Amino acid sequence: MTITVESLKRPEGSKPRALRRSGLIPANLYGHKGTESISLTIEAKTVERLLKRVSVNNTLIELNIADAPWRGKALLRELQIHPAKGTPYHLSFFAVAGHGDTTVEVRLRFVGTAVGVKQEGGVLDTVITELQVSCAPENIPDVIEIDVTNLQIGDSLSISDIPFPEGVTPLAELERLVVSVLPPQISADDAGTETETAS
């Protein structure tokens, strides 16, 4: 999924607080021409729509700086939220064109109902729900699906068990635990009943 965002260069000497009062959110684009950065402004309404569809370090964005002029692919690297108002405060983008593989965070989606949960009353324990991977910008997956249907109580899946799309490489240790099925949880009342029965 690629999303197009229109932006403008930030006027020199402009104050971030004044920009926000006028309905503009300050932003920066890094990685443009190597280490050069560009100060930007984006309309608050555009940012609001963007954040409904984009995750930090995940979604490829077509960023258009109308008065630069510059247009290219970028990732939203950082999002600052106002501590009191809970509204977007500042955005940082990273230009990915010409940088080869990039590092992104990808959500994990667990599909199916584990046998150990459905038939044996076990509990599905998801240890991680996001994973850092390396891939080319055009290969960034929106989500990585993991089928847990065949997991029984005591079974687990590690990163090495995940079928990654071609060109996507996990950056965490392959032995790292992702999901497992735990035995049914016994309540205090049930435990007391079992103790009385045993005695």
Curated annotation (Swiss-Prot):
The protein's matches in HAMAP family, at most eight in alphabetical order, are given as: Ribosomal_bL25_CTC
* One Pfam family, short name: Ribosomal_L25p
Is rRNA processing found in the keyword set? no
**Upper lineage:** Bacteria, Bacillati, Cyanobacteriota, Cyanophyceae, Nostocales
Record carries keyword rRNA-binding: yes
Which keywords appear in this protein's UniProt record, sorted alphabetically? Ribonucleoprotein, Ribosomal protein, RNA-binding, rRNA-binding
Q: What does this protein do?
A: This is one of the proteins that binds to the 5S RNA in the ribosome where it forms part of the central protuberance.
Summarize the subunit comment: Part of the 50S ribosomal subunit; part of the 5S rRNA/L5/L18/L25 subcomplex. Contacts the 5S rRNA. Binds to the 5S rRNA independently of L5 and L18.
In its UniProt entry, the species of origin is given as Nostoc punctiforme (strain ATCC 29133 / PCC 73102)
Q: Where are the transmembrane segments?
A: none
Cellular component (GO) terms are: cytosolic large ribosomal subunit
What family, per the record?
Belongs to the bacterial ribosomal protein bL25 family. CTC subfamily.
In alphabetical order, the GO MF annotations are: 5S rRNA binding; structural constituent of ribosome
Q: Name one GO biological process term.
A: translation
Provide the protein name.
Answer: Large ribosomal subunit protein bL25
